[in-house]
Structures are given as C-alpha cells and as structure tokens.
Amino acid sequence: MQRYLISYEFNDGEDQEIGGDMLVKWYETGGVENRPETYEVHSWVFMIQNGTGHCVVSADSLDTIWILWHPWRKLMDISIQPCLDLEETISLIKKTRP
C-alpha cells in the first residue's frame, strides 16, 4: 500500500458546519469500523479554528481514498499527495547515494 497525505480546507463556515454534522453521523454509525482493510489512517489533525486539516493514510489506490472522501468533496478543497514516513525517507536516501 502507498502512503498519502490528504490535506483539506472547507469552503466556508457553513460548509464546515455541514461537514461536522456529516462526520459525527459517519462516526456514530460505525464509520471507522466500516473502512476497507486496504485503507489505514496513521494520523489525523483538524484545525477547527480555520477549517483545515491533514491526515496521513495508507491505501491500495486513489480510488479507495475517493470512495471514502467523496461525500465531503462539495464542501471542501481536497488535495492528495504520495508521501513517506521518516523510515521510508531514510531508506530512499540511502538507496540513491553511491
């Protein structure tokens, strides 16, 4: 599985409020338990004061990520980028050095 950084920012305060309600409903109806085995969250942070957040996940494909994130797409700008953790970064640097 590939590791990804997902960054997001709500369009405005109203969309953030709608998104918050959606998140609570998703969470209370077993959202975490219903994630596919091919999607793992490593960390998640949300700065509620400005409506932005970031999470690091591992997933088998971008399709898996978009299936999970599509309900929020109209409420926020979402950016997904491949990333590495510290050990993966060190390993890559060592492999590229002579």
PLM features: residue spans?
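Conserved short beta-strand edge segments in small beta-sheet-based binding/regulatory domains
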Residues: 75-87
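Short S/T/G/P-rich N-terminal loop/turn motif that feeds into the first structured element of a domain
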Residues: 1-52, 60-64, 88-98
